[in-house]
């Protein structure tokens, strides 16, 4: 190779082989292109493009650039930033991840040599072992104290037994006032025997705990010694790969073993039920049908047999579904908030600290009980030496208790407070999961009539980790599903009881701060409203609940209000969420019943569509906006009226009755079509809300008398409509039936604007036919001296009123600020004539305009569907107002339509879950306002031409432009796919770059931006494919796993396998004993199986008769636990180690898992020792085979290190012996990729001797 080639080769960057994806080395030979190679050096490339260097003088090859010794740091102390010193290289493996190569020492390691995380882990392991040793000492001391109590109890039992056996005491002929009453003595004897049995059982539990803790500590000690025995305390890559494969094998054994355990537990449930039957039959056969687990009858689900809302019509069903969807989203958001709070609590209490506190408090209790036992001993029959020992023991116990209480008060108080807060959050989370599940089932009941689907995939707090399918995560290894959802350790209760005993002993008043904390939390829990646990399935009550409006076209331009302000604003406000399970942030006033306070409808009915549009037009003019309202939005299939979702809540009209909805089937919904095409993404406005003024109105119609009873009960927050300027201002309500009402009714005037209570009832004679054509208008009027002013209006459609039912509902009050030019619509006095005349005049003007205009406003339906209508009105669509309007009237929209704006971009991988977070658009039925609406729209400033859908495009010449403008100058808005049917000027043709005509109703984005899930713009408009990332970009900021992490993961898997095998063995023994007891009808064992709490908890986990909701809740809790862990990991700063996770790993080894109860020795059957030899059926054969397989896996895994070292030695030796004959890396570099392939291809390279007798080792880059 010439010198010119030698100077050019270094400038060539390595080109990775397309099939080489296993290892990536970060070498950049181009960085030294300005420096020539030393004399005698050459550059070459292997088969995958990796550059290596040839030393012709020493006849060696290496991966290291010889020029690095002049440009790179010589040691780690000289490194700056992410630099590595000379001889070190960072590489990447697709299975293992990043690892590091030390070419000088010819070693590889998993840890980053620049980081000190390994030393921090070793120090943490040492500290934890020290703390675990203290905890173990507490357990041993507790064992000693309990042993002393057992000795005292045994002594007392022996004493009573002797008295009972004495004929002089039991068979005495003395009177009943003798020294020992036989009946009392027998009772004392039974109590003493039971006390001895219970103490023995507790002693057995403590022994098991001690052995479990000792085994875990021994495992941690062995892990530390094993890592310290390694060179540099690191595993090489071959060992890491072997450990990973072994972990996967153990995981497979765990999966199969867990199936066996579940089968055994199910069989235990059946045996327990059979024992319960036998026990009941023996005691009272009549109770069998009442208490048998298999004869229960549950009628809880009968209300769902026909489906929720099966009897409802289309509009009512869709409204109910929309309301339920909103509540479901609110609960999901509440669950995420609770998950976030729980993730914050994890860092406050170190893993294992609560267990240590429990042991400390239990030790105090044991000492207290021992002290009481010693105080109850009679010293009369004792010797002097025994008396001295007892007195010394008492004195020592009193001193120990004093010191223990002082230490407990100072150290445990804060942890108990954090633990209690965590338990409250867990209880709220459990309640939230229950309520979410109920709402989810209710939403699924609408699936037969809806195109929307609900998935229970994961909660909002879920975060995608995108881990490899072949790798085990932290939650897979260290989270025990049987430990999730168990009754937590009530350390606070233990502490209170212990404190009470100490205070009684010392006769001191309570001073422990934990008691005060508990009382405070109880008070807060009483004052804070909790989510309801039951769902009302009544169609009338559920449909009368408000569905807040929202627009899919808006974006959130308003910053979030502080949470405290939002809660304060909603505290006294009755909302829709109270009728169904709702987050605690939304409550009704205590004086209002839940079923009524939650009811709130809009102030205007469906007949007031024109008035709504006029109000919004006035609002636009007030805001000085040039473009008026554009009614081109998506229309629901059950509505022929614009949904008006973009209006403020005070302007919306909505029917709340259930029976007289007159909805008409119209065109196919844009939402359903676009949703089916996969391009529709519904979004919702995320805007804060203010307090709304409301009026509670009751309506009832007396058919026999022909009288409408109107009850104006109370109002709420009228100060939001008007601020009193003087102290003598008063407010009253005035109501009238429009149109053509000559009389009006009014309430008494009150000075309270916040919560005035009127309680006025009026009877209005009117026939039912006329009533259904009327609208009830209620105005809020203020009086300041002699001056009256209308500040708000409520309008209720009587066409939707159900005369067979009475209603009492809250209605939002529309402020008069929104209708400054239409104040004449309100009644100025007790007479309604002026108002009726004004309305009639407005109708005449609109009708005249309608007759003068020849073009009706129409627009093509989505994907060319036919419009079916029984009305004379035409189909229109509601489009979002301009962006300027959105920014101006944003504060008028309710806050509870803000659906999870913060978690929309959390998980880009869960499309199914994201679909669940989309809201349903509630549709409103059309009555008689179509013609009026068309007439009004034709008089708007900007009109739209009547054009049919056609695929032929014909633009007229520019010379005909003036003539065309004279005919019709209204712009035509179409999608790119479809073109106008007639000749249209290009200036009038507003083309939207959307995929199909079903997209024409979607918002046309003004600013392009990258894709964000749940954002305003459509994905098809905003998604830009990102450039693929290079696989060689390995600069991650997270802390990688160390060898200590890897060894802990492996030992955790082995520990789980060991205890799983032990549990299976105990369950098999227990099953055999209980089965024989069932066959023999043993009453003792049957009583034990029914009364033993530990056994009851065990079988309750696998009870097939358990309510499906409970099983689903258990799964949700398990999933939520994993999501909390993932959420907490996201809080760890980049580049910082996760200290809490490492502590949880260590705590796993000393944490006690599921325990299998053991029968007392007195209950064991004589032939219970030969359980393993008996085989009843094929299922037990499978159980035995699986247990043998697990045992085999345990034995095989114990020789891992030995096999690893031998395999590594043989592989290295084989590579050395055979690779030395390989001639040149340039001709045959493949055999040196890894030691194993090198042995297989060495024979092929023996006959290719050319120039050099050395090769390149892919890991170390030196001659071998």
Curated annotation (Swiss-Prot):
Residues in C2 domain copies: 691-811
Entry keyword set: Cell membrane, Coiled coil, Cytoplasm, Membrane, Phosphoprotein, Repeat, Transcription, Transcription regulation
InterPro entries with a match to the protein in the record: C2_dom, C2_domain_sf, WW_dom, WW_dom_sf, WWC/KIBRA_Hippo_Reg
UniProt record, GO biological process: cell migration; negative regulation of organ growth; positive regulation of hippo signaling; regulation of DNA-templated transcription
Bias-annotated ranges (Low complexity): 1-14, 513-544, 845-856, 864-876
SUPFAM superfamilies: C2 domain (Calcium/lipid-binding domain, CaLB) (SSF49562), WW domain (SSF51045)
Ranges where the WW domain occurs: 35-68, 82-115
Positions of region (Disordered): 1-40, 513-545, 845-880, 1200-1254
Record-level GO cellular component terms: apical plasma membrane; cytoplasm
Family listed: Belongs to the WWC family. KIBRA subfamily.
Oligomeric and partner information: Forms a complex with Mer and Ex. Interacts (via domain WW 1) with Ex (via RXPPXY motif). Interacts with Mer, Sav, Hpo and Wts.
Name of this protein: Protein kibra
Organism this protein belongs to: Drosophila mojavensis
Organism lineage string: Eukaryota, Metazoa, Ecdysozoa, Arthropoda, Hexapoda
Gene: Kibra
């Amino acid at each position: 190779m010439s010198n010119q080639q030698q100077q050019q080769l270094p400038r060539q960057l390595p080109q990775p082989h397309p099939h080489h994806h296993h290892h990536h080395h970060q070498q950049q030979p181009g960085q030294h292109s300005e420096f020539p190679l030393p004399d005698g050096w050459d550059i070459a490339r292997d088969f995958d493009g990796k550059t290596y260097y040839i030393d012709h003088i020493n006849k060696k090859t290496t991966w290291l650039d010889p020029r690095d010794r002049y440009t790179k740091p010589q040691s780690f102390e000289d490194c700056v930033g992410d630099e590595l010193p000379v001889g070190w290289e960072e590489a990447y493996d697709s299975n293992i991840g990043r690892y590091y190569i030390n070419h000088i020492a010819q070693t590889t390691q998993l840890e980053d040599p620049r980081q000190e995380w390994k030393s921090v882990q070793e120090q943490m392991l040492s500290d934890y072992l020290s703390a675990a040793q203290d905890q173990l000492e507490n357990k041993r001391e507790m064992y000693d104290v309990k042993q002393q109590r057992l000795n005292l109890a045994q002594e007392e039992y022996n004493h009573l037994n002797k008295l009972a056996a004495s004929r002089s005491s039991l068979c005495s002929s003395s009177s009943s006032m003798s020294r020992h009453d036989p009946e009392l003595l027998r009772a004392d004897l039974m109590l003493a025997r039971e006390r001895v049995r219970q103490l023995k059982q507790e002693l057995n539990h403590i022994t098991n705990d001690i052995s479990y803790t000792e085994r875990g500590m021994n495992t941690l000690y062995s892990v530390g010694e094993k890592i310290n025995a390694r060179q540099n305390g690191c595993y090489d890559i071959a060992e890491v790969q072997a450990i990973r494969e072994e972990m996967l094998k153990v995981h497979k054994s765990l999966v199969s073993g867990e199936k066996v355990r579940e089968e055994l537990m199910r069989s235990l449930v059946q045996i327990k039920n059979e024992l319960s039957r036998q026990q009941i039959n023996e005691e009272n056969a009549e109770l069998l049908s009442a208490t048998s687990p298999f004869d229960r009858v549950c009628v809880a689900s009968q209300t769902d047999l026909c489906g929720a809302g099966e009897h409802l019509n289309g509009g009512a069903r869709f409204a109910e579904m929309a309301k339920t969807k909103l509540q479901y989203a609110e609960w999901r958001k509440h669950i995420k908030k609770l998950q976030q709070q729980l993730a914050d609590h994890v860092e406050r209490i170190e893993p294992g600290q609560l267990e240590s506190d429990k042991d400390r408090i239990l030790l105090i209790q044991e000492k207290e009980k021992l002290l009481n036992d010693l105080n109850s001993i009679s010293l009369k029959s004792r010797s002097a030496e025994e008396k001295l020992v007892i007195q010394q023991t008492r004195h020592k116990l009193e001193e120990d208790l004093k010191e223990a209480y002082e230490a407990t008060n100072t150290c445990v108080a804060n942890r108990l407070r954090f633990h209690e807060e965590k338990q409250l959050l867990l209880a709220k989370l459990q309640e939230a999961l229950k309520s979410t599940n109920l709402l989810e089932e209710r939403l699924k009941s609408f699936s037969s009539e809806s195109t929307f689907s609900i998935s229970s995939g994961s909660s909002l707090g879920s975060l995608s980790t995108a881990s490899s399918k072949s790798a085990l995560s932290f939650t897979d290894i260290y989270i025990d599903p049987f430990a999730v959802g168990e009754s937590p350790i009530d350390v606070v209760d233990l502490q209170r009881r212990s404190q009470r005993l100490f205070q009684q002993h010392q006769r001191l008043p309570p001073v422990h701060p934990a008691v005060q904390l508990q009382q405070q939390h109880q008070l807060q829990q009483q004052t804070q409203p909790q989510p309801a646990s039951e769902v009302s399935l009544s169609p009338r009550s559920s449909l009368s609940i408000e569905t807040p409006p929202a627009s899919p076209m808006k974006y959130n331009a308003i910053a979030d209000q502080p949470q405290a302000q939002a809660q304060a604003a909603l505290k006294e406000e009755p909302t829709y969420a109270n009728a169904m399970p709702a987050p605690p942030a939304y409550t009704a006033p205590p004086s209002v019943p839940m079923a009524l306070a939650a009811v709130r409808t809009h102030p205007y009915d469906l007949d007031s569509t024109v008035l709504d549009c006029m109000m919004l037009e006035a609002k636009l003019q007030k805001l000085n906006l040039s473009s008026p309202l554009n009614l081109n939005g998506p229309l629901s299939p059950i509505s022929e009226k614009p949904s008006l979702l973009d209006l403020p809540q005070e302007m919306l009209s909505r029917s709340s009755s259930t029976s007289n909805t007159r909805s008409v089937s119209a065109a196919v919904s844009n939402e359903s079509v676009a949703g089916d095409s996969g391009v529709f993404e519904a979004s919702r406005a995320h805007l804060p809300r203010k307090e709304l003024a409301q009026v509670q109105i009751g309506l009832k119609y007396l058919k026999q008398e022909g009288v409408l009873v109107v009850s104006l009960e109370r109002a709420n927050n009228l100060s939001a409509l008007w601020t009193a300027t003087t102290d003598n201002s008063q407010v009253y309500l005035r109501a009238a039936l429009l149109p053509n009402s000559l009389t009006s009714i009014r309430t008494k005037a009150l000075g309270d604007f916040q919560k005035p209570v009127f309680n006025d009832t009026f009877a209005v004679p009117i026939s039912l036919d006329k009533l259904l054509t009327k609208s009830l208008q209620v105005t809020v009027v203020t009086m300041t001296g002699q001056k009256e002013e209308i500040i708000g209006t409520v309008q209720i459609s009587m066409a939707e009123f159900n005369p067979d039912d009475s209603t009492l509902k809250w209605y939002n009050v529309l402020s008069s600020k929104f209708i400054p030019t239409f104040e004449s619509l309100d009644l100025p006095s007790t007479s309604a004539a002026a108002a009726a005349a004004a309305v009639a005049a407005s109708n005449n003007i609109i009708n005249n305009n309608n007759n003068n205009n020849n073009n009706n406003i129409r627009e093509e339906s989505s994907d060319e569907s036919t419009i079916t209508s029984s009305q004379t009105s035409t189909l229109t669509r509601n489009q979002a107002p301009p962006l300027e309007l959105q920014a101006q009237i944003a504060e008028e929209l309710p806050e509870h339509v803000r659906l999870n704006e913060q978690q929309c971009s959390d998980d880009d991988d869960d499309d199914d879950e994201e679909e669940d977070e989309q809201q349903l658009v509630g549709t409103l039925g059309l009555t008689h306002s179509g013609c009026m609406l068309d007439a009004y729209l034709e008089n708007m400033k900007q009109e739209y031409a009547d054009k049919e859908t056609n695929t032929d495009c014909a633009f007229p010449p520019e010379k005909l432009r003036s003539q065309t403008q004279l005919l019709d100058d209204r712009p035509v808005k179409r999608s790119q796919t479809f073109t106008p049917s007639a000749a249209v000027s290009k200036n009038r043709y507003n083309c939207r770059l959307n995929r199909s005509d079903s997209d024409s109703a979607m918002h046309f984005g003004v600013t392009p931006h990258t894709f964000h899930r749940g954002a305003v713009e459509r994905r098809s408009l905003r998604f830009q494919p990102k450039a693929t990332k290079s696989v060689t970009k390995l600069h991650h900021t997270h802390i990688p796993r160390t060898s200590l992490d890897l060894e802990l993961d492996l030992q955790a898997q082995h520990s789980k396998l060991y205890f799983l095998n032990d549990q299976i063995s105990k369950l098999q023994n227990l099953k055999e004993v209980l089965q024989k007891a069932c066959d023999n009808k043993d009453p003792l064992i049957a009583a034990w199986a029914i009364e033993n709490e530990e056994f009851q908890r065990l079988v309750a986990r696998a009870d097939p008769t358990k309510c499906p909701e409970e099983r689903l809740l258990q799964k949700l809790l398990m999933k939520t636990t994993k999501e909390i862990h993932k959420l907490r990991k996201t809080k760890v700063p980049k580049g910082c180690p996760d200290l809490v996770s490492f502590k949880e790993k260590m705590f796993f080894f000393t944490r006690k898992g599921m325990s299998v109860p053991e029968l007392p020795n007195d209950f064991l059957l004589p032939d219970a020792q030969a359980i393993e030899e008996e085989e009843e059926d094929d299922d037990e054969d499978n159980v035995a085979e699986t247990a043998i397989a697990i045992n085999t896996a345990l034995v095989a895994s114990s020789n891992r290190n030995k096999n690893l070292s031998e395999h590594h030695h043989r592989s290295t030796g084989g590579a050395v012996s055979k690779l030395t004959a390989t001639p040149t890396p340039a001709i045959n570099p493949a055999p040196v990729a890894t030691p194993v392939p090198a042995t297989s291809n060495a024979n092929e390279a023996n006959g290719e001797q050319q120039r050099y007798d050395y090769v390149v080792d892919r890991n170390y880059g030196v001659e071998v």
